[in-house]
UniProtKB/Swiss-Prot annotation:
Residue ranges occupied by any ABC transporter domain in the UniProt entry: 3-237
Residues that hold ATP according to the record: G35, P36, S37, G38, C39, G40, K41, T42
Record's subunit section: The complex is composed of two ATP-binding proteins (CysA), two transmembrane proteins (CysT and CysW) and a solute-binding protein (CysP).
Name of the protein this chain belongs to: Sulfate/thiosulfate import ATP-binding protein CysA
SMART domains linked to this entry: AAA
Matches recorded under Pfam families: ABC_tran (PF00005), TOBE_3 (PF12857)
Gene source species: Pseudomonas syringae pv. tomato (strain ATCC BAA-871 / DC3000)
GO MF: ABC-type sulfate transporter activity; ABC-type thiosulfate transporter activity; ATP binding; ATP hydrolysis activity
Organismal lineage: Bacteria, Pseudomonadati, Pseudomonadota, Gammaproteobacteria, Pseudomonadales
Localization of this protein: Cell inner membrane
A GO CC term attached to the entry: ATP-binding cassette (ABC) transporter complex
Matching InterPro entries: AAA+_ATPase (IPR003593), ABC_SmlMolc_Importer (IPR050093), ABC_transporter-like_ATP-bd (IPR003439), ABC_transporter-like_CS (IPR017871), Mo/tungstate-bd_C_term_dom (IPR008995), P-loop_NTPase (IPR027417), Sulph_transpt1 (IPR005666), TOBE-like (IPR024765)
Length: 326
């Protein structure tokens, strides 16, 4: 099921949430809407779902304009950040709910519903929890049940709004890898909202970077990271440094793309060490360059030669190995 977003705009009183957004999503694609809070990503997702109505523009599913269709007629599965499971129902009944609510003419019999529910619970690897209640589950288990429930009605499109945002970091990492594998198996057109660039990079086929109601860049994870279209995209997709070149503008580079030396070397900049911060396998060194307003951060392996006996206030010499001039 392909999705076309055509010139969509949306205002909330004086606030312009979306400004003439256009986007094509191919059938079977997993697309991330990535951006900071207030950028319009959730509003766009809700408009695709039919939960919000655009002021201008249209939404097209597989060539059909569905802008005037009710959310119930769009056949989308929606997974929210906070699970939205029914507390008084077992896991089995939660997953079966959508099937039992179908019109009588479309509703499967209870035998088929049971088969379908167990198929889905096996798919999310939680069939053994069918008789439990939501409060007896971990956060990660609840979110997988919420996903199974969304898939039970066989939606044409799966929409996920910050699906892992309420979970701790370790569980988020496990679940996003699981979601990427699951998507390969079900091949369902999916759109998910996130503000976590690492999550988008790991899960999505393509990333739509949004800011202040507009799309800044669309591309594969590699494309947007290696070839950002502007300063905003570069900074949003990871830690970054800015080195001013005066009238020639500035260059941007990542902390892990910095060469450090205790010895003065040609083309390296002198800088004062302001902070040394061990980060496990790496160490972050914060540097102050004379004449520069912004501090420079470098990350090197913890046993790097430049770190031996290094103390705050000493001078290091650095050079960006790779940089972007924007």
């Amino acid at each position: 099921m392909s999705i076309e977003v055509r010139n969509v705009s949306k205002n909330f009183n004086a606030f312009k949430a979306l400004n003439n957004i256009s986007l094509d999503i191919q059938s079977g694609e997993l697309v991330a809407l990535l951006g900071p809070s207030g950028c319009g990503k959730t509003t766009l997702l809700r408009i695709i779902a039919g939960l919000e109505t655009p002021d201008d523009g249209s939404i097209v599913f597989h060539g059909e304009d569905v802008s005037g269709h009710d959310v119930r007629d769009r056949n989308v599965g929606f997974v929210f950040q906070h699970y939205a499971l029914f507390r008084h129902m077992t896991v089995f009944d939660n997953v079966a709910f959508g099937l039992r609510m179908k019109p009588k003419s479309e509703r499967p019999n209870e035998t088929r519903i049971a088969e379908k529910v167990h198929e889905l619970l096996n798919m999310v690897q939680l069939d053994w929890l069918a008789d439990r209640y939501p409060e007896q589950l971990s956060g990660g288990q609840r979110q997988r049940i919420a996903l199974a429930r969304a898939l039970a009605v066989e939606p044409k499109v799966l929409l996920l709004d910050e699906p892992f945002g309420a979970l701790d970091a370790k569980v988020r990492k496990e679940l996003r890898r699981w979601l990427a594998r699951l998507h390969e198996d079900i091949n369902l057109t999916s759109v998910f909202v996130t503000h976590d660039q690492e999550e988008a990079m790991e899960v999505a086929d393509r990333i739509v970077v949004m800011n202040k109601g507009v799309i800044e860049q669309i591309g594969s994870p590699g494309e947007v990271y290696e070839n950002p279209s502007n300063d905003f995209v570069y900074h949003f997709l990871g830690d970054s440094n800015r080195l001013s070149l005066g009238d020639e503008g500035h260059v941007l580079f990542r902390p892990h793309e910095v060469s450090l030396s205790r010895q003065e070397i040609e083309d390296h900049h002198a800088a004062e060490v302001r902070d040394i911060r061990p980060l496990g396998a790496t160490t972050r060194v914060t540097l102050k360059v004379e004449g520069q307003n912004e501090l420079i951060e470098a990350e090197v392996v913890k046993d790097h030669d430049s770190l031996v006996g290094l103390a705050k206030g000493e001078t290091l010499f650095f050079k960006p190995k790779v940089w972007q001039k924007l």
